[in-house]
Regions:
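Flavin (primarily FAD) cofactor-binding/catalytic cores of flavoenzymes
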Residues: 1-57, 111-643, 647, 652-654, ...
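Redox-cofactor-proximal catalytic regions of oxidoreductases
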Residues: 47-110, 597
Length: 680
């Protein structure tokens, strides 16, 4: 009898796929006398950087996380079932690279960046890609005996049970070049942001723009867009003022040989003459807030005062039958946590250190009622102008009536300068940025509360998806302060103009005038109406299963082998989230009948809605959830190589309710800490 070769396929070889590969190696190494396993790595782009972090992209594109807070390796903080095999963070690797520890042959620009990169410096995306490429080489070259790898530089277009295998639960992956990988024991989907087809409203808008002969650039990663279609002097609207906006802005200015210099401490832009005339707008009308300068080091974080893991577990148990309501059960805790840090830091900044700690105790003890918290604030002499106001922070122009574009631009420049000054105060010493950084630090706790149906469906859609997630992005995941300084300089140089809030954009076909264009205006800024020749959607494609442009997910959806995650509401129906449905950890893929597949796993961006903020990267020293997830998936996949599908934990029909959010918080299939023997 011929022994069957054991194999695993990892689809997507960016940071998440790389983490799974590292965990496969670590867990395989810990097995006593394991049988050989071959790993197929499928990605049309180089493994490690993948598409998003490829090393040939513009040096003007930056990460929005500092170098000391970026890693792909496990560390002592991570709650692993598998073995710990630490490696360097991005900054630690850069120090070693700059010192010549990795030999010769590295490009001069990479060595130069390595030598100037500090732990609190924002690296270029291409440099992070070099780190990921090195990490992939380290992981695969140091793999244990018996674990081998083959890379396939193609898209995966289909995943099916293998009809030719003796055990027909084994898997078959078909690639775009018609290669078929059969007899697979496990397949792990580690995809990132994927292309998406336009919805009905977007299709109608695009069709009208095309009919008028207008240029319209759809949502995309700015690094992938050919901006040569925007010649110098073209009037263009960047619709969106988030992170993608800053990427486009950099490529259309510094990327076209414009330069910045310091003049009397102020940043000044010197145009090259090759820039388009840039206009920008969004619903909020102002850009994401600048990140506070990091004072927390690589591993520091705000430790929860109210939203602890224990409290979340109690809340989920109490509301297990109905699901939590974000506004009622979670937002009061999040908001008080942020406010407490703001006032405590404000008092500390004024020299009242002892009083600041007592204030924290009193404010937390006051409970959620504003009458009580206002009394505490007044007792500590905090005046009205220093009071925390969520609505004003979300809409800082709330109390303004603008008289025209010049008035709005003047106000905006003052707002941006104040934001930069607040960022320079730091994320520990500065009251505003210290408070906003709490939102970033609480992401893991919020995930514990909302993941896997923690909220009822109506609250997920209305409170989390449409309200808190965009607010959190605006307040806590913005660009480095330098980017906002550059924006100020570009406005002052006349290269950039921001239209205003609640922008309206329409296609004017030119009937009667002979000149087509986009008309743009803000109802809050009188006289803001203008016309542009081109429109760039400055955002990433939607995360959507029903409209995905990925051929693999389209195949799985069309054949009923995957389904959208549905979250129960407090009525008889469920909210269709349009995210990819998976079980609780280790995240087995669920089919249209609600059955988890014993040999298929998925995590990352396509599972948004099962999990929250899936695009967040791996951070060292804070028990990164991505690392614990990849460890659990790798262990489950290795169990598949040693066990018949019928005995794989979690393979039975008992998890079929996972698509309606009824699986337990933090639930997972058994993965024993020692070895990989399946649980019984």
């Amino acid at each position: 009898m011929t022994t069957r070769h054991r194999s695993v396929c990892v689809i997507g070889a960016g940071p998440r796929g790389l983490s799974v590969l590292e965990r496969l190696c670590a867990n395989f190494r810990s097995q006593p006398e394991p049988s050989p396993v071959h790993v197929h790595v499928v990605d049309p782009y180089p493994p490690g950087p993948g598409k998003v972090w490829r090393t040939d992209q513009s040096p003007h594109l930056l990460m929005n996380t500092v170098a000391g807070q970026i890693s792909v390796f496990t560390d002592a903080s991570v709650d692993l079932s598998g073995p710990l095999e630490p490696g360097p963070s991005l900054h630690e690797w850069a120090v070693a690279l700059g010192a010549g520890e990795f030999g010769d042959g590295h490009p001069a620009e990479a060595l130069a960046e390595a030598r100037r990169l500090g732990p609190d410096t924002y690296p270029t995306r291409a440099f992070y890609g070099r780190y990921l490429r090195w990490a992939y080489q380290r992981v695969t070259s140091g793999a244990p005996a018996g674990l081998t790898f083959t890379t396939h530089p193609h898209l995966a277009v289909a995943l099916d049970d293998d009809p030719d295998a003796e055990d027909q639960t084994l898997q078959r992956v078909t690639l775009a070049d018609h290669t078929v990988l059969g007899g697979l024991d496990a397949v792990i989907l580690c995809q990132g942001h994927l292309p998406a087809r336009a919805d009905a409203a977007e299709r109608d808008f695009t069709a009208r723009a095309r009919q008028a002969g207008l240029l319209h650039i759809a949502p995309a990663n700015p690094a992938d867009v050919d901006l040569d279609v925007l010649p110098p002097g073209t009037t263009v609207l960047l619709r969106g003022l988030g992170l993608n906006f800053f990427d486009y802005l950099a490529q259309l200015t510094a990327g076209r040989d414009g330069t910045f210099s310091r003049v009397g401490g102020r940043l000044v832009y010197h145009p090259s003459g090759r820039e388009p005339q840039i206009h920008a707008a969004s619903r909020r009308g102002i850009p994401y807030q600048a990140r506070g300068e990091n004072e927390k080091g690589p591993h520091g974080r705000h430790e929860p005062l109210l939203l602890s893991a224990e409290r979340i577990a109690r809340l989920r148990r109490t509301h297990e039958s109905t699901g939590l309501d974000f506004r009622d059960q979670l937002w009061p805790l999040i908001s008080r946590e942020v406010e407490t840090v703001y006032y405590r830091t404000l008092l500390t900044s004024r020299g009242y250190t002892a009083e600041a700690q007592q204030f924290q105790d009193d404010y937390l003890a006051a409970g959620p009622h504003q009458r009580h918290t206002d009394a505490v604030i007044a007792a500590y002499g905090i005046g009205e102008k220093d009071r925390w106001d969520w609505d004003l922070i979300a809409r800082p122009y709330r109390d303004r009536e603008f008289t025209g574009p010049g008035d709005f631009t003047g106000w905006l420049l003052d707002h941006l300068r104040e934001d930069v000054a607040e960022a320079h105060c730091g994320n520990v010493s500065g009251p505003l940025k210290a408070a906003l950084d709490v939102l970033r630090d609480l992401r893991n706790e919020i995930r514990l509360a909302v993941d896997h149906g923690g909220l009822h469906g109506d609250s997920y859609r209305t409170d989390l998806d449409r309200w808190y997630t965009p607010l959190n992005a605006y307040l806590s995941i913005g660009p480095p302060a330098r980017r906002v300084e550059e924006m100020i300089a570009l406005i002052e140089a006349g290269v950039l103009h921001v239209v205003g809030p609640q922008v309206h954009v329409e296609v004017d076909t030119g009937t009667g005038t002979g000149r087509a264009g986009y008309t743009v205006s803000s109802p809050l800024v009188p006289g803001s109406e203008l016309r542009v020749d081109a429109l760039v959607e400055a955002r990433l494609p939607d995360i959507t299963l029903s409209r995905t442009g990925d051929p693999l997910l389209r195949h799985l959806l069309a054949t009923g082998q995957c389904t959208a995650y549905r979250i129960r509401t407090r009525r008889a129906d469920a909210y269709d989230s349009d995210g990819l449905a998976v079980t609780a950890r280790p995240f087995r893929l669920i089919d249209a009948a609600g059955r988890p597949h014993p040999r298929r796993f998925a995590f990352g961006v396509p599972t948004e809605s099962v999990h929250w903020v899936t695009a967040a990267g791996i951070r060292p020293g804070v028990n990164s959830v991505t690392l614990t997830d990849s460890d659990a998936i790798a262990r489950a996949a290795l169990i598949c190589t040693t066990t018949a599908a019928a005995t794989v934990p979690g393979a039975g029909p008992e998890q079929s309710t996972a698509t309606t959010g009824t699986n337990p918080p933090g639930g997972q299939s058994p993965t024993p800490r020692q070895g990989l023997t399946p649980a019984h």
